[in-house]
Amino acid sequence: MANPLYHKHIISINDLSRDELELVLRTAASLKKTPQPELLKHKVIASCFFEASTRTRLSFETSIHRLGASVVGFSDSSNTSLGKKGETLADTMSVISTYVDAIVMRHPQEGASRLAAQFSGNVPIVNAGDGANQHPTQTLLDLFTIQETQGRLDNINIAMVGDLKYGRTVHSLTQALAKFNGNHFFFIAPDALAMPAYILQMLEEKEIEYSLHESLEEVVPELDILYMTRVQKERLDPSEYANVKAQFILRSSDLTGARDNLKVLHPLPRIDEITTDVDKTPYAYYFQQAGNGIFARQALLALVLNAELAL
C-alpha cells in the first residue's frame, strides 16, 4: 500500500489528516510490540537542535539508532557556521540536505522549520519544536499515550492546565484532538497565560465543546486526561513569571474523586507544578508518556523514509 507520508515534511500537526495520524499510531504500536532494528539501515538523519533540549533530542537520536540509521548533527548552534559566521538558515539547510536523508530540527524562532523546508529539496524536515508555535512529534506521542491508556481518541474529556499561551505542546494537541469526535476541552490557566484566541476560534468553528476555568478542583471528577504544563520561564519576563509560576500546582490530594481511568500527563520537564507525591498514585503516567516518544518518533521517521511500509 502506498504510504502518504513518504518524503512529507512534518512541520505542523495540521499537516497530518486523521487517517495519517492513525497510520502513525498504528505503526508506533507495531514498533513497540515488535522492534525493527534494520528498518532504516544505511539511512543518515541530521539532528539539528538550535535550541536546548534533553528529552526530545535524546528520544529522536535513540529512535534513529534503534531503526538502524546513523545520526549526525549538533545540539549547540553557537558552534556552527550559522552561529559563529552568520550563515543564513536557508544556506545551512541547503547544505545539510545534500548530506542526509531527513532532517530533525528544533529552533527558537516560530516558522523556522517551514522556512527550512523551502530549502531542503526533497529531504523531509521533521519539526522538533519551533518557538511557541508547534511541536508535532510531542503531539504524536501524546496521542499514542491517550489511545494506549483510554483505548480511544474520541469522546475524551481533557483538561489542559498552566501555560496555555506559550506552551506549543497544548496548541498542537488541541488541534490534533479536534480531528476526532466528541472531545471536550477544559482550559485552566491564569489570564496572562490563556489559550490563544486562534485555538479557541478553531474549536468554535468546528463546534467542539470547550470551557474555561480558574480552578482545577471543579473539573477533576469529569476528566479522562489531565495534561499539566510548566510555566515557561524562558518565554516570560521575570515579573510575569513570579506572578504565575505557582498558581496551578497539582498535589495527590487534588485527585480525590477522580475517575479510575484518569491519567495525568506532562510534556516535561517538570519544575514544581506536579508534586512528587503524585508520582506514587495510579494516575501518574508522564514518565511512561515520555518513553512512548521513542515509538511515536520511530514510526514517523519510518513512514517518512519508506515509500511502502507494512508492519
Curated annotation (Swiss-Prot):
Family matches, as Gene3D superfamilies: Aspartate/ornithine carbamoyltransferase
Keywords noted in UniProt: Pyrimidine biosynthesis, Transferase
Top EC class for this record: transferase
GO molecular function: amino acid binding; aspartate carbamoyltransferase activity
Binding, carbamoyl phosphate: 55-56, 106, 135, 138, 268-269
Residue numbers binding L-aspartate: 85, 168, 230
Reactions catalysed according to its record: carbamoyl phosphate + L-aspartate = N-carbamoyl-L-aspartate + phosphate + H(+)
InterPro entries recorded: Asp/Orn_carbamoyltranf_P-bd, Asp/Orn_carbamoylTrfase, Asp/Orn_carbamoylTrfase_sf, Asp_carbamoyltransf, Asp_carbamoyltransf_Asp/Orn-bd
Keyword hit for Cell membrane: no
One of the Pfam families matching this protein, by short name: OTCace
Top-rank taxon: Bacteria
Gene Ontology terms describing biological process: 'de novo' pyrimidine nucleobase biosynthetic process; 'de novo' UMP biosynthetic process; amino acid metabolic process
Pathway: Pyrimidine metabolism; UMP biosynthesis via de novo pathway; (S)-dihydroorotate from bicarbonate: step 2/3
EC number(s) per entry: 2.1.3.2
Tagged with keyword Transferase: yes
Coiled-coil features, chain-numbered ranges: none
Its biological purpose: Catalyzes the condensation of carbamoyl phosphate and aspartate to form carbamoyl aspartate and inorganic phosphate, the committed step in the de novo pyrimidine nucleotide biosynthesis pathway.
NCBIfam families in the record: asp_carb_tr, PRK00856.1
Protein family per UniProt: Belongs to the aspartate/ornithine carbamoyltransferase superfamily. ATCase family.
Record text on subunit structure and interactions: Heterododecamer (2C3:3R2) of six catalytic PyrB chains organized as two trimers (C3), and six regulatory PyrI chains organized as three dimers (R2).
Listed name of the protein: Aspartate carbamoyltransferase catalytic subunit
Organism, as annotated: Yersinia pestis
